[in-house]
């Protein structure tokens, strides 16, 4: 998926305080921008020069190459 598309989807989810799942061919990473939702991870950085997004996880950080993303599912609260 293109970096600009990923960033647009996630920034829209953030402004609407939504949550969802980023799916790659071998991994799913949950995220949440909902206030007070501590059960899921949060997107913390977009790096345009490498086209990677960083997700702060419970046990470790995830770094996802945008080209590896197959789908992003976004859900309303």
Where are these regions (language model features)?
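A short beta-strand micro-motif
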Residues: 4, 18-24
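A short, compositionally biased
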Residues: 12-19, 47-51
């Amino acid at each position: 998926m293109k970096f600009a598309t990923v960033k647009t989807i996630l920034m829209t989810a953030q402004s609407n305080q939504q949550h969802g799942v980023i799916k790659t061919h071998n991994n799913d990473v949950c995220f949440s921008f909902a206030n007070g939702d501590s059960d899921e991870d949060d997107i913390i950085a977009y790096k345009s020069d490498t086209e990677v997004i960083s997700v702060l996880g419970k046990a470790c950080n995830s770094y996802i190459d945008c080209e590896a993303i197959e789908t992003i599912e976004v859900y309303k609260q």
